[in-house]
Amino acid sequence: QGTANEIAIRGLLHATSPMTVMNVTGPETVSIKKVSEKLGKYLGKKPIFEGEEGNDAYLNDASLAMEIFGYPDVCAETLIRWQAEYILDGGRTLNKPTHFEERKGNY
């Protein structure tokens, strides 16, 4: 969240009218299945998947954000490991569904 918060504040300097669309996400394209498997490995658990993988996916193009703000200081691999450490250390979770199966943008 640190990088996203920093970009949100720094982004005010780049506000335009009419607006410019800018996706703020990591530079890597990551598979939810692969991330789940990696997180499960850190946690000593095997993820359980329901349903079938879709033939399409939502991808965000963060190239404009990367051009303006640079690459984040923390890579996806480190974020996954940190999340596992947080959970293993007894960190609080909200136990809410992820809605990764959502295909119409209604979260």
Regions found by a protein language model. Give the residues of each.
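A general structural signal for well-ordered secondary-structure junctions
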Residues: S17-P18, Y71, T93
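Mid/C-terminal beta-alpha module of Rossmann-like enzyme folds, strongest
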Residues: G2-L64, F100-Y107
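Residue-level detector of secondary-structure transition/capping positions
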Residues: L12, L43, D73, A84-L88
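A polyampholytic, Gly/Pro-enriched intrinsically disordered region
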Residues: M66-A76
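Amphipathic terminal alpha-helices
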Residues: S63, A76-Y107
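Short, amphipathic alpha-helical "lid/cap" segments that border enzyme active or binding sites
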Residues: Q1-I9, E77-A84
